[in-house]
Amino acid sequence: MEGSDLLLAGILFLFAAVVAVPIAARLGIGAVLGYLLAGIAIGPWGLGFISDVDEILHFSELGVVFLMFLIGLELNPSKLWKLRRSIFGIGAAQVLLSAVVLAGLLMLTDFAWQAAVVGGIGLAMSSTAMALQLMRDKGMNRTEGGQLGFSVLLFQDLAVIPALAMVPLLAGNGDEHPDWLKIGMKVLAFAVMLVGGRYLLRPVFRFIAGSGVREVFTAAALLLVLGSALFMDLLGLSMALGTFIAGILLAESEYRHELEIAIEPFKGLLLGLFFISVGMALNLGVLYTHILWVVMSVVVLVSVKMAVLYGLGRFQGLRRTERLPFAGVLSQGGEFAFVLFSSASSQKLFHNDQMALLLVTVTLSMMTTPLVMKGIDRLLARHFNAPDEDAEMPYVEDDKPQVIIVGFGRFGQVIGRLLMANKMRITVLERDISAVNLMRKYGYKVYYGDATELELLRAAGAESAQSIVVTCNDPEDTMRIVHLCQQHFPQMEILARARGRVEAHELLQAGVKQFSRETFSSALELGRKTLISLGMHPHQAQRAQLHFRRLDMRMLRELMPVHTDNAQISRVREARRELEEIFHREMQQERRQLDGWDEFE
Protein backbone atom coordinates (compact mmCIF):
# COMPACT_ATOMS: atom_id res chain seq x y z
CA MET A 1 0.00 0.00 0.00
CA GLU A 2 1.22 3.49 -0.85
CA GLY A 3 1.24 6.25 1.75
CA SER A 4 -1.91 7.97 0.48
CA ASP A 5 -3.76 4.64 0.21
CA LEU A 6 -2.76 3.74 3.76
CA LEU A 7 -3.98 7.11 5.04
CA LEU A 8 -7.28 6.69 3.20
CA ALA A 9 -7.68 3.18 4.61
CA GLY A 10 -7.07 4.51 8.12
CA ILE A 11 -9.71 7.22 7.68
CA LEU A 12 -12.20 4.66 6.34
CA PHE A 13 -11.54 2.32 9.27
CA LEU A 14 -12.09 5.08 11.81
CA PHE A 15 -15.21 6.37 10.04
CA ALA A 16 -16.71 2.88 9.79
CA ALA A 17 -16.03 2.22 13.47
CA VAL A 18 -17.44 5.58 14.59
CA VAL A 19 -20.66 4.96 12.64
CA ALA A 20 -21.22 1.21 13.05
CA VAL A 21 -20.19 0.56 16.65
CA PRO A 22 -22.54 3.11 18.33
CA ILE A 23 -25.42 1.82 16.18
CA ALA A 24 -24.59 -1.76 17.16
CA ALA A 25 -24.43 -0.75 20.83
CA ARG A 26 -27.84 0.93 20.61
CA LEU A 27 -29.29 -2.19 18.97
CA GLY A 28 -27.82 -4.25 21.81
CA ILE A 29 -25.72 -6.55 19.58
CA GLY A 30 -22.34 -5.49 20.96
CA ALA A 31 -19.31 -3.61 19.66
CA VAL A 32 -17.60 -6.71 18.22
CA LEU A 33 -20.47 -7.44 15.84
CA GLY A 34 -20.54 -3.73 14.98
CA TYR A 35 -16.88 -3.88 13.90
CA LEU A 36 -17.57 -6.98 11.78
CA LEU A 37 -20.52 -5.33 10.03
CA ALA A 38 -18.42 -2.22 9.42
CA GLY A 39 -15.78 -4.39 7.77
CA ILE A 40 -18.35 -6.00 5.48
CA ALA A 41 -19.64 -2.56 4.50
CA ILE A 42 -16.28 -1.10 3.41
CA GLY A 43 -14.71 -4.33 2.13
CA PRO A 44 -14.44 -5.69 -1.42
CA TRP A 45 -17.84 -7.38 -1.20
CA GLY A 46 -19.56 -4.33 0.27
CA LEU A 47 -18.97 -0.80 -1.00
CA GLY A 48 -15.52 -1.83 -2.24
CA PHE A 49 -13.55 1.01 -0.66
CA ILE A 50 -10.70 -1.35 0.32
CA SER A 51 -9.56 -4.37 -1.67
CA ASP A 52 -6.17 -5.37 -0.18
CA VAL A 53 -7.68 -7.38 2.68
CA ASP A 54 -4.80 -9.84 3.21
CA GLU A 55 -2.24 -7.14 4.01
CA ILE A 56 -4.56 -5.35 6.41
CA LEU A 57 -5.59 -8.63 8.07
CA HIS A 58 -1.94 -9.48 8.72
CA PHE A 59 -1.29 -6.03 10.22
CA SER A 60 -4.46 -6.18 12.31
CA GLU A 61 -3.22 -9.34 14.08
CA LEU A 62 -1.28 -6.88 16.24
CA GLY A 63 -4.54 -6.33 18.11
CA VAL A 64 -4.44 -9.94 19.32
CA VAL A 65 -0.74 -9.50 20.12
CA PHE A 66 -1.38 -6.50 22.40
CA LEU A 67 -4.33 -8.27 24.02
CA MET A 68 -2.23 -11.32 24.88
CA PHE A 69 0.46 -9.08 26.42
CA LEU A 70 -2.11 -7.50 28.73
CA ILE A 71 -3.44 -10.94 29.67
CA GLY A 72 0.09 -12.06 30.48
CA LEU A 73 0.47 -9.06 32.80
CA GLU A 74 -2.53 -10.29 34.79
CA LEU A 75 -1.04 -13.77 35.28
CA ASN A 76 2.06 -14.38 37.32
CA PRO A 77 3.93 -17.70 36.87
CA SER A 78 2.40 -19.20 40.03
CA LYS A 79 -1.14 -18.58 38.73
CA LEU A 80 -0.20 -20.05 35.36
CA TRP A 81 1.21 -23.14 37.08
CA LYS A 82 -2.11 -23.64 38.86
CA LEU A 83 -3.86 -23.67 35.47
CA ARG A 84 -1.59 -26.35 33.99
CA ARG A 85 -4.12 -29.17 34.34
CA SER A 86 -6.95 -27.25 32.73
CA ILE A 87 -4.63 -25.99 29.95
CA PHE A 88 -3.21 -29.38 28.97
CA GLY A 89 -6.23 -31.40 30.09
CA ILE A 90 -9.45 -29.62 29.12
CA GLY A 91 -7.70 -27.54 26.44
CA ALA A 92 -6.20 -30.57 24.73
CA ALA A 93 -9.46 -32.51 24.99
CA GLN A 94 -11.43 -29.66 23.40
CA VAL A 95 -9.11 -29.37 20.41
CA LEU A 96 -8.86 -33.14 19.91
CA LEU A 97 -12.58 -33.95 20.26
CA SER A 98 -13.75 -30.98 18.18
CA ALA A 99 -11.17 -31.66 15.46
CA VAL A 100 -12.08 -35.36 15.18
CA VAL A 101 -15.82 -34.69 14.90
CA LEU A 102 -15.46 -31.78 12.47
CA ALA A 103 -12.89 -33.59 10.32
CA GLY A 104 -15.23 -36.56 10.06
CA LEU A 105 -18.08 -34.31 8.93
CA LEU A 106 -15.84 -32.62 6.34
CA MET A 107 -14.91 -36.01 4.90
CA LEU A 108 -18.63 -36.65 4.36
CA THR A 109 -18.74 -33.51 2.16
CA ASP A 110 -16.08 -34.64 -0.35
CA PHE A 111 -13.02 -33.25 1.45
CA ALA A 112 -9.90 -35.40 1.07
CA TRP A 113 -8.83 -36.84 4.41
CA GLN A 114 -5.72 -34.60 4.53
CA ALA A 115 -7.79 -31.46 3.87
CA ALA A 116 -10.41 -32.66 6.36
CA VAL A 117 -7.77 -33.04 9.10
CA VAL A 118 -6.47 -29.51 8.54
CA GLY A 119 -10.04 -28.19 8.30
CA GLY A 120 -11.07 -29.96 11.51
CA ILE A 121 -8.10 -28.61 13.47
CA GLY A 122 -8.62 -25.09 12.11
CA LEU A 123 -12.34 -25.09 12.91
CA ALA A 124 -11.64 -26.46 16.41
CA MET A 125 -9.75 -23.24 17.25
CA SER A 126 -11.68 -20.34 18.78
CA SER A 127 -11.16 -16.62 18.37
CA THR A 128 -8.88 -15.44 21.17
CA ALA A 129 -9.69 -11.80 20.46
CA MET A 130 -13.46 -12.24 20.41
CA ALA A 131 -13.71 -14.70 23.29
CA LEU A 132 -11.55 -12.65 25.67
CA GLN A 133 -13.37 -9.44 24.77
CA LEU A 134 -16.76 -11.04 25.41
CA MET A 135 -15.55 -12.63 28.65
CA ARG A 136 -14.46 -9.22 29.89
CA ASP A 137 -17.74 -7.61 28.82
CA LYS A 138 -19.76 -10.34 30.57
CA GLY A 139 -17.65 -10.30 33.73
CA MET A 140 -16.58 -13.93 33.22
CA ASN A 141 -12.93 -13.25 34.11
CA ARG A 142 -13.66 -13.75 37.80
CA THR A 143 -15.63 -16.99 37.35
CA GLU A 144 -14.47 -20.60 37.09
CA GLY A 145 -15.96 -20.77 33.60
CA GLY A 146 -13.92 -17.75 32.52
CA GLN A 147 -10.69 -19.23 33.91
CA LEU A 148 -11.39 -22.52 32.14
CA GLY A 149 -12.15 -20.66 28.91
CA PHE A 150 -8.84 -18.84 29.15
CA SER A 151 -7.02 -22.15 29.67
CA VAL A 152 -8.62 -23.59 26.52
CA LEU A 153 -7.64 -20.52 24.50
CA LEU A 154 -4.07 -20.69 25.75
CA PHE A 155 -3.76 -24.34 24.70
CA GLN A 156 -5.16 -23.47 21.28
CA ASP A 157 -2.43 -20.84 20.87
CA LEU A 158 0.15 -23.50 21.70
CA ALA A 159 -1.50 -26.05 19.38
CA VAL A 160 -1.16 -23.77 16.35
CA ILE A 161 2.60 -24.40 16.25
CA PRO A 162 2.48 -28.21 15.72
CA ALA A 163 -0.59 -27.78 13.49
CA LEU A 164 1.37 -25.57 11.09
CA ALA A 165 4.27 -28.02 11.16
CA MET A 166 1.86 -30.83 10.26
CA VAL A 167 0.59 -29.20 7.04
CA PRO A 168 3.64 -30.01 4.82
CA LEU A 169 3.63 -33.59 6.13
CA LEU A 170 -0.04 -34.03 5.20
CA ALA A 171 0.69 -32.59 1.76
CA GLY A 172 3.52 -35.09 1.27
CA ASN A 173 6.13 -32.32 1.11
CA GLY A 174 7.74 -32.92 4.49
CA ASP A 175 11.43 -33.66 4.79
CA GLU A 176 12.30 -37.26 5.59
CA HIS A 177 15.16 -36.03 7.74
CA PRO A 178 14.25 -32.96 9.77
CA ASP A 179 16.91 -30.32 10.31
CA TRP A 180 17.59 -30.95 13.99
CA LEU A 181 20.22 -28.21 14.07
CA LYS A 182 17.65 -25.66 12.95
CA ILE A 183 15.14 -26.94 15.49
CA GLY A 184 17.78 -26.83 18.22
CA MET A 185 18.67 -23.24 17.36
CA LYS A 186 15.01 -22.23 17.66
CA VAL A 187 14.71 -23.91 21.06
CA LEU A 188 17.93 -22.21 22.20
CA ALA A 189 16.71 -18.80 20.99
CA PHE A 190 13.42 -19.30 22.82
CA ALA A 191 15.30 -20.20 26.02
CA VAL A 192 17.50 -17.10 25.65
CA MET A 193 14.35 -14.97 25.37
CA LEU A 194 12.95 -16.47 28.59
CA VAL A 195 16.15 -16.10 30.60
CA GLY A 196 16.97 -12.66 29.20
CA GLY A 197 13.47 -11.42 29.85
CA ARG A 198 13.52 -12.80 33.38
CA TYR A 199 16.69 -10.96 34.41
CA LEU A 200 16.93 -7.95 32.07
CA LEU A 201 13.43 -6.50 31.66
CA ARG A 202 13.01 -5.08 35.17
CA PRO A 203 16.42 -3.31 35.27
CA VAL A 204 15.77 -1.87 31.79
CA PHE A 205 12.36 -0.51 32.78
CA ARG A 206 13.81 0.80 36.05
CA PHE A 207 16.37 2.77 34.03
CA ILE A 208 13.70 4.10 31.63
CA ALA A 209 11.31 5.05 34.45
CA GLY A 210 14.17 6.95 36.09
CA SER A 211 14.17 9.40 33.18
CA GLY A 212 10.74 10.64 34.27
CA VAL A 213 9.58 11.01 30.65
CA ARG A 214 6.27 9.22 30.20
CA GLU A 215 6.52 9.13 26.39
CA VAL A 216 9.77 7.15 26.60
CA PHE A 217 8.13 4.61 28.89
CA THR A 218 5.26 4.20 26.41
CA ALA A 219 7.76 3.78 23.57
CA ALA A 220 9.62 1.13 25.58
CA ALA A 221 6.37 -0.75 26.23
CA LEU A 222 5.55 -0.73 22.50
CA LEU A 223 9.10 -1.84 21.67
CA LEU A 224 8.79 -4.76 24.08
CA VAL A 225 5.46 -5.94 22.64
CA LEU A 226 6.36 -5.54 18.97
CA GLY A 227 9.92 -6.81 19.47
CA SER A 228 8.84 -10.02 21.22
CA ALA A 229 6.16 -10.55 18.55
CA LEU A 230 8.71 -10.14 15.74
CA PHE A 231 11.22 -12.41 17.49
CA MET A 232 8.67 -15.22 17.81
CA ASP A 233 7.53 -14.72 14.22
CA LEU A 234 11.13 -15.11 13.00
CA LEU A 235 11.33 -18.37 14.95
CA GLY A 236 8.19 -19.57 13.19
CA LEU A 237 6.17 -19.45 16.42
CA SER A 238 3.00 -17.60 17.43
CA MET A 239 3.47 -13.83 17.83
CA ALA A 240 0.69 -13.78 20.42
CA LEU A 241 2.46 -16.47 22.44
CA GLY A 242 5.64 -14.38 22.51
CA THR A 243 3.95 -11.27 23.88
CA PHE A 244 1.98 -13.40 26.34
CA ILE A 245 5.26 -14.74 27.77
CA ALA A 246 6.68 -11.19 27.91
CA GLY A 247 3.62 -10.13 29.89
CA ILE A 248 4.02 -13.02 32.34
CA LEU A 249 7.67 -12.11 32.92
CA LEU A 250 6.57 -8.60 33.99
CA ALA A 251 3.43 -9.66 35.89
CA GLU A 252 5.14 -9.41 39.28
CA SER A 253 7.11 -6.25 38.51
CA GLU A 254 6.39 -2.82 39.95
CA TYR A 255 5.76 -1.51 36.42
CA ARG A 256 2.80 -3.78 35.67
CA HIS A 257 0.06 -1.16 36.06
CA GLU A 258 2.01 1.53 34.22
CA LEU A 259 2.52 -0.89 31.31
CA GLU A 260 -1.21 -1.66 31.22
CA ILE A 261 -2.01 2.06 30.99
CA ALA A 262 0.55 2.58 28.21
CA ILE A 263 -0.65 -0.36 26.07
CA GLU A 264 -4.43 -0.24 26.61
CA PRO A 265 -5.31 2.44 23.97
CA PHE A 266 -3.31 0.67 21.25
CA LYS A 267 -4.89 -2.67 22.13
CA GLY A 268 -8.43 -1.32 21.78
CA LEU A 269 -7.82 0.35 18.42
CA LEU A 270 -5.95 -2.60 16.92
CA LEU A 271 -8.55 -5.10 18.13
CA GLY A 272 -11.20 -3.01 16.42
CA LEU A 273 -9.07 -3.04 13.27
CA PHE A 274 -8.78 -6.82 13.51
CA PHE A 275 -12.54 -7.35 13.68
CA ILE A 276 -13.11 -4.90 10.81
CA SER A 277 -10.54 -6.83 8.75
CA VAL A 278 -12.30 -10.11 9.47
CA GLY A 279 -15.56 -8.58 8.25
CA MET A 280 -13.80 -7.38 5.08
CA ALA A 281 -12.51 -10.91 4.43
CA LEU A 282 -16.06 -12.31 4.23
CA ASN A 283 -16.51 -13.50 0.63
CA LEU A 284 -20.15 -12.69 -0.10
CA GLY A 285 -19.81 -14.23 -3.58
CA VAL A 286 -19.12 -17.68 -2.11
CA LEU A 287 -21.83 -17.11 0.48
CA TYR A 288 -24.36 -16.31 -2.25
CA THR A 289 -23.53 -19.31 -4.46
CA HIS A 290 -23.29 -21.82 -1.57
CA ILE A 291 -25.76 -20.26 0.87
CA LEU A 292 -27.30 -23.55 2.07
CA TRP A 293 -23.93 -25.26 2.60
CA VAL A 294 -22.53 -22.27 4.49
CA VAL A 295 -25.56 -21.81 6.77
CA MET A 296 -25.63 -25.52 7.64
CA SER A 297 -21.87 -25.47 8.23
CA VAL A 298 -22.10 -22.53 10.63
CA VAL A 299 -24.94 -24.17 12.58
CA VAL A 300 -23.07 -27.50 12.75
CA LEU A 301 -19.77 -25.83 13.74
CA VAL A 302 -21.30 -23.81 16.57
CA SER A 303 -23.44 -26.75 17.75
CA VAL A 304 -20.56 -29.27 17.76
CA LYS A 305 -18.20 -26.95 19.63
CA MET A 306 -20.85 -25.97 22.17
CA ALA A 307 -21.71 -29.63 22.79
CA VAL A 308 -18.04 -30.57 23.28
CA LEU A 309 -17.36 -27.58 25.53
CA TYR A 310 -20.54 -28.10 27.56
CA GLY A 311 -19.58 -31.73 28.17
CA LEU A 312 -16.04 -30.78 29.18
CA GLY A 313 -17.39 -28.09 31.49
CA ARG A 314 -19.60 -30.66 33.16
CA PHE A 315 -16.68 -33.09 33.45
CA GLN A 316 -14.56 -30.33 35.02
CA GLY A 317 -17.27 -29.67 37.61
CA LEU A 318 -18.50 -26.28 36.43
CA ARG A 319 -21.81 -25.19 37.88
CA ARG A 320 -24.74 -25.65 35.53
CA THR A 321 -25.14 -21.90 35.23
CA GLU A 322 -21.52 -21.47 34.04
CA ARG A 323 -21.45 -24.27 31.46
CA LEU A 324 -23.56 -22.50 28.84
CA PRO A 325 -21.60 -19.20 28.91
CA PHE A 326 -18.34 -21.21 28.83
CA ALA A 327 -19.55 -23.19 25.81
CA GLY A 328 -21.06 -20.21 24.01
CA VAL A 329 -18.12 -17.84 24.30
CA LEU A 330 -15.76 -20.35 22.61
CA SER A 331 -18.23 -21.68 20.01
CA GLN A 332 -16.89 -19.72 17.03
CA GLY A 333 -14.03 -20.35 14.64
CA GLY A 334 -10.89 -18.30 15.22
CA GLU A 335 -8.30 -16.09 13.62
CA PHE A 336 -5.72 -18.90 13.61
CA ALA A 337 -7.91 -20.74 11.09
CA PHE A 338 -7.01 -18.03 8.55
CA VAL A 339 -3.31 -18.72 9.07
CA LEU A 340 -3.68 -22.51 9.03
CA PHE A 341 -5.94 -22.60 5.95
CA SER A 342 -3.64 -20.22 4.05
CA SER A 343 -0.70 -22.52 4.75
CA ALA A 344 -2.71 -25.55 3.62
CA SER A 345 -3.80 -23.76 0.46
CA SER A 346 -0.19 -22.97 -0.44
CA GLN A 347 0.52 -26.73 -0.14
CA LYS A 348 -2.38 -27.50 -2.55
CA LEU A 349 -4.39 -29.38 0.09
CA PHE A 350 -7.68 -27.66 -0.79
CA HIS A 351 -9.48 -27.90 -4.12
CA ASN A 352 -11.90 -25.54 -5.87
CA ASP A 353 -13.81 -23.36 -3.37
CA GLN A 354 -13.05 -25.46 -0.29
CA MET A 355 -10.80 -22.89 1.40
CA ALA A 356 -13.19 -20.01 0.61
CA LEU A 357 -16.10 -22.01 2.07
CA LEU A 358 -14.18 -22.72 5.27
CA LEU A 359 -13.16 -19.07 5.67
CA VAL A 360 -16.74 -17.87 5.15
CA THR A 361 -17.91 -20.41 7.73
CA VAL A 362 -15.32 -19.22 10.26
CA THR A 363 -16.18 -15.54 9.69
CA LEU A 364 -19.93 -16.06 10.00
CA SER A 365 -19.45 -18.20 13.12
CA MET A 366 -17.58 -15.27 14.68
CA MET A 367 -20.53 -13.03 13.87
CA THR A 368 -22.94 -15.43 15.60
CA THR A 369 -21.11 -15.42 18.94
CA PRO A 370 -22.44 -12.08 20.29
CA LEU A 371 -25.95 -13.24 19.35
CA VAL A 372 -25.39 -16.66 20.95
CA MET A 373 -24.19 -15.01 24.17
CA LYS A 374 -27.17 -12.68 24.15
CA GLY A 375 -29.47 -15.70 23.78
CA ILE A 376 -27.69 -17.49 26.64
CA ASP A 377 -28.13 -14.39 28.83
CA ARG A 378 -31.86 -14.38 28.10
CA LEU A 379 -32.11 -18.12 28.78
CA LEU A 380 -30.33 -17.78 32.12
CA ALA A 381 -32.40 -14.72 32.99
CA ARG A 382 -35.60 -16.66 32.27
CA HIS A 383 -34.33 -19.53 34.41
CA PHE A 384 -33.35 -17.38 37.38
CA ASN A 385 -36.16 -14.86 37.18
CA ALA A 386 -38.95 -17.43 36.94
CA PRO A 387 -40.87 -17.88 40.21
CA ASP A 388 -39.92 -20.99 42.16
CA GLU A 389 -43.06 -22.76 43.31
CA ASP A 390 -41.19 -24.93 45.82
CA ALA A 391 -39.28 -22.08 47.38
CA GLU A 392 -40.17 -20.57 50.74
CA MET A 393 -42.13 -17.34 50.76
CA PRO A 394 -39.56 -14.60 50.27
CA TYR A 395 -39.11 -11.77 52.74
CA VAL A 396 -40.33 -9.31 50.11
CA GLU A 397 -43.90 -10.29 49.26
CA ASP A 398 -45.11 -7.30 47.29
CA ASP A 399 -44.59 -7.53 43.53
CA LYS A 400 -44.16 -3.75 43.33
CA PRO A 401 -40.87 -2.77 44.96
CA GLN A 402 -40.27 0.62 46.49
CA VAL A 403 -36.58 0.54 45.58
CA ILE A 404 -34.55 -1.19 42.86
CA ILE A 405 -30.87 -1.79 43.61
CA VAL A 406 -28.60 -2.36 40.61
CA GLY A 407 -25.48 -4.29 41.57
CA PHE A 408 -25.02 -6.16 44.83
CA GLY A 409 -21.32 -6.01 45.57
CA ARG A 410 -19.94 -4.73 48.87
CA PHE A 411 -21.37 -1.25 48.29
CA GLY A 412 -24.83 -2.45 47.27
CA GLN A 413 -25.06 -5.02 50.06
CA VAL A 414 -24.75 -2.37 52.77
CA ILE A 415 -27.56 -0.36 51.17
CA GLY A 416 -29.72 -3.46 50.76
CA ARG A 417 -29.28 -4.58 54.36
CA LEU A 418 -30.15 -1.11 55.65
CA LEU A 419 -33.32 -0.96 53.55
CA MET A 420 -34.35 -4.51 54.48
CA ALA A 421 -33.83 -3.75 58.17
CA ASN A 422 -36.29 -0.88 57.76
CA LYS A 423 -38.92 -3.12 56.08
CA MET A 424 -38.51 -1.55 52.64
CA ARG A 425 -39.59 -3.56 49.61
CA ILE A 426 -36.57 -3.96 47.35
CA THR A 427 -35.64 -5.73 44.14
CA VAL A 428 -32.01 -6.44 43.27
CA LEU A 429 -30.63 -6.66 39.72
CA GLU A 430 -27.34 -8.55 39.51
CA ARG A 431 -25.19 -10.00 36.69
CA ASP A 432 -23.16 -12.37 38.87
CA ILE A 433 -24.91 -15.76 38.88
CA SER A 434 -23.31 -16.93 42.14
CA ALA A 435 -24.48 -13.74 43.86
CA VAL A 436 -28.01 -14.34 42.54
CA ASN A 437 -28.06 -17.86 44.01
CA LEU A 438 -26.83 -16.62 47.38
CA MET A 439 -29.26 -13.70 47.52
CA ARG A 440 -32.28 -15.89 46.79
CA LYS A 441 -31.36 -18.19 49.64
CA TYR A 442 -31.65 -15.21 51.98
CA GLY A 443 -35.09 -14.30 50.63
CA TYR A 444 -34.17 -11.34 48.46
CA LYS A 445 -36.13 -10.79 45.28
CA VAL A 446 -33.36 -10.93 42.68
CA TYR A 447 -33.35 -10.70 38.90
CA TYR A 448 -30.40 -12.04 36.98
CA GLY A 449 -29.45 -10.02 33.91
CA ASP A 450 -28.06 -6.80 32.51
CA ALA A 451 -29.76 -3.74 33.99
CA THR A 452 -28.86 -1.70 30.92
CA GLU A 453 -31.67 -3.57 29.13
CA LEU A 454 -35.03 -1.81 29.28
CA GLU A 455 -37.10 -5.00 29.47
CA LEU A 456 -35.26 -6.21 32.56
CA LEU A 457 -35.93 -2.91 34.35
CA ARG A 458 -39.61 -3.21 33.45
CA ALA A 459 -39.74 -6.80 34.69
CA ALA A 460 -38.16 -5.68 37.96
CA GLY A 461 -40.97 -3.18 38.58
CA ALA A 462 -39.32 0.06 37.49
CA GLU A 463 -42.64 1.51 36.28
CA SER A 464 -44.00 1.61 39.83
CA ALA A 465 -40.83 1.88 41.95
CA GLN A 466 -40.14 5.12 43.82
CA SER A 467 -36.33 4.99 43.63
CA ILE A 468 -33.46 3.22 41.93
CA VAL A 469 -30.00 2.92 43.48
CA VAL A 470 -27.25 2.31 40.89
CA THR A 471 -24.10 0.76 42.40
CA CYS A 472 -22.41 -0.64 39.26
CA ASN A 473 -18.66 -1.09 39.09
CA ASP A 474 -18.58 0.11 35.47
CA PRO A 475 -19.09 3.89 35.10
CA GLU A 476 -20.37 3.46 31.54
CA ASP A 477 -23.07 1.04 32.73
CA THR A 478 -24.03 3.52 35.44
CA MET A 479 -24.56 6.32 32.92
CA ARG A 480 -26.51 4.03 30.54
CA ILE A 481 -28.89 3.06 33.34
CA VAL A 482 -29.27 6.68 34.43
CA HIS A 483 -30.22 7.81 30.90
CA LEU A 484 -32.55 4.82 30.48
CA CYS A 485 -34.39 5.60 33.72
CA GLN A 486 -34.65 9.31 32.94
CA GLN A 487 -36.17 8.52 29.55
CA HIS A 488 -38.56 5.69 30.43
CA PHE A 489 -39.18 5.93 34.20
CA PRO A 490 -39.19 9.65 35.06
CA GLN A 491 -41.12 9.05 38.29
CA MET A 492 -38.16 7.25 39.89
CA GLU A 493 -35.65 9.16 41.94
CA ILE A 494 -32.16 8.15 40.83
CA LEU A 495 -29.44 7.61 43.42
CA ALA A 496 -26.01 6.50 42.26
CA ARG A 497 -22.57 5.46 43.38
CA ALA A 498 -19.65 7.51 42.07
CA ARG A 499 -16.17 6.03 42.24
CA GLY A 500 -14.52 9.47 42.16
CA ARG A 501 -14.83 13.13 41.21
CA VAL A 502 -14.94 12.48 37.45
CA GLU A 503 -17.97 10.22 37.79
CA ALA A 504 -19.53 12.67 40.21
CA HIS A 505 -19.22 15.43 37.58
CA GLU A 506 -20.79 13.16 34.95
CA LEU A 507 -23.71 12.36 37.25
CA LEU A 508 -24.22 16.05 37.98
CA GLN A 509 -24.22 16.84 34.27
CA ALA A 510 -26.83 14.12 33.74
CA GLY A 511 -29.06 15.74 36.37
CA VAL A 512 -28.51 13.21 39.16
CA LYS A 513 -28.54 15.11 42.45
CA GLN A 514 -28.35 12.19 44.86
CA PHE A 515 -25.03 10.38 44.63
CA SER A 516 -22.30 9.19 46.95
CA ARG A 517 -18.57 9.03 46.31
CA GLU A 518 -17.62 5.63 47.64
CA THR A 519 -14.45 6.64 49.53
CA PHE A 520 -15.38 10.22 50.43
CA SER A 521 -17.54 9.64 53.52
CA SER A 522 -15.25 7.02 55.05
CA ALA A 523 -12.22 9.26 54.40
CA LEU A 524 -13.97 12.21 56.06
CA GLU A 525 -14.83 10.09 59.09
CA LEU A 526 -11.22 9.00 59.46
CA GLY A 527 -10.17 12.64 59.02
CA ARG A 528 -12.52 13.66 61.86
CA LYS A 529 -10.93 11.07 64.14
CA THR A 530 -7.49 12.33 63.13
CA LEU A 531 -8.44 15.90 64.16
CA ILE A 532 -9.60 14.59 67.55
CA SER A 533 -6.34 12.67 67.98
CA LEU A 534 -4.49 15.95 67.36
CA GLY A 535 -6.31 17.62 70.26
CA MET A 536 -9.36 19.20 68.59
CA HIS A 537 -12.60 19.07 70.58
CA PRO A 538 -14.97 16.34 69.23
CA HIS A 539 -17.71 18.93 68.58
CA GLN A 540 -15.33 21.12 66.58
CA ALA A 541 -14.05 18.10 64.65
CA GLN A 542 -17.62 17.10 63.75
CA ARG A 543 -18.41 20.65 62.68
CA ALA A 544 -15.19 20.82 60.61
CA GLN A 545 -16.14 17.58 58.89
CA LEU A 546 -19.62 18.86 57.99
CA HIS A 547 -18.29 22.20 56.75
CA PHE A 548 -15.71 20.49 54.59
CA ARG A 549 -18.35 18.18 53.12
CA ARG A 550 -20.62 21.10 52.26
CA LEU A 551 -17.85 23.22 50.74
CA ASP A 552 -16.38 20.32 48.77
CA MET A 553 -19.80 19.64 47.27
CA ARG A 554 -20.11 23.32 46.41
CA MET A 555 -16.75 23.22 44.63
CA LEU A 556 -17.80 20.04 42.84
CA ARG A 557 -20.91 21.77 41.48
CA GLU A 558 -19.11 24.99 40.54
CA LEU A 559 -16.39 23.18 38.61
CA MET A 560 -18.73 20.71 36.94
CA PRO A 561 -19.12 22.71 33.68
CA VAL A 562 -15.33 22.83 33.11
CA HIS A 563 -14.23 19.44 34.48
CA THR A 564 -13.29 18.12 31.02
CA ASP A 565 -11.45 21.29 29.92
CA ASN A 566 -7.70 21.04 30.53
CA ALA A 567 -7.35 24.79 29.99
CA GLN A 568 -9.37 25.45 33.15
CA ILE A 569 -6.82 24.05 35.61
CA SER A 570 -6.06 27.56 36.85
CA ARG A 571 -9.78 28.07 37.51
CA VAL A 572 -9.81 24.88 39.58
CA ARG A 573 -6.90 26.08 41.69
CA GLU A 574 -8.50 29.49 42.17
CA ALA A 575 -11.80 27.96 43.26
CA ARG A 576 -9.98 25.69 45.68
CA ARG A 577 -8.21 28.69 47.28
CA GLU A 578 -11.53 30.54 47.59
CA LEU A 579 -13.21 27.61 49.29
CA GLU A 580 -10.29 27.14 51.67
CA GLU A 581 -10.62 30.81 52.71
CA ILE A 582 -14.38 30.44 53.24
CA PHE A 583 -13.80 27.28 55.27
CA HIS A 584 -11.19 29.04 57.42
CA ARG A 585 -13.48 32.03 58.10
CA GLU A 586 -16.45 29.87 59.10
CA MET A 587 -14.35 27.74 61.41
CA GLN A 588 -12.84 30.84 63.03
CA GLN A 589 -16.32 32.18 63.82
CA GLU A 590 -17.27 28.93 65.57
CA ARG A 591 -13.92 28.25 67.21
CA ARG A 592 -15.29 29.09 70.67
CA GLN A 593 -18.50 27.04 70.32
CA LEU A 594 -17.26 23.76 71.75
CA ASP A 595 -20.65 22.26 72.56
CA GLY A 596 -23.46 21.22 70.23
CA TRP A 597 -23.49 19.42 66.90
CA ASP A 598 -24.49 20.85 63.55
CA GLU A 599 -27.71 19.11 62.54
CA PHE A 600 -27.37 19.18 58.79
CA GLU A 601 -24.73 19.67 56.14
UniProtKB/Swiss-Prot annotation:
Biological role: Pore-forming subunit of a potassium efflux system that confers protection against electrophiles. Catalyzes K(+)/H(+) antiport.
Membrane topology, record value: Multi-pass membrane protein
Chain's gene name: kefB
Keyword DNA-binding: no
UniProt-listed NCBIfam families: 2a37 (TIGR00932), PRK03659.1 (NF002973)
Protein name: Glutathione-regulated potassium-efflux system protein KefB
Organism in which the protein naturally occurs: Cronobacter sakazakii (strain ATCC BAA-894) (Enterobacter sakazakii)
Subunit structure: Interacts with the regulatory subunit KefG.
Similarity section: Belongs to the monovalent cation:proton antiporter 2 (CPA2) transporter (TC 2.A.37) family. KefB subfamily.
An individual GO BP term: proton transmembrane transport
Major site of localization recorded for this protein: membrane
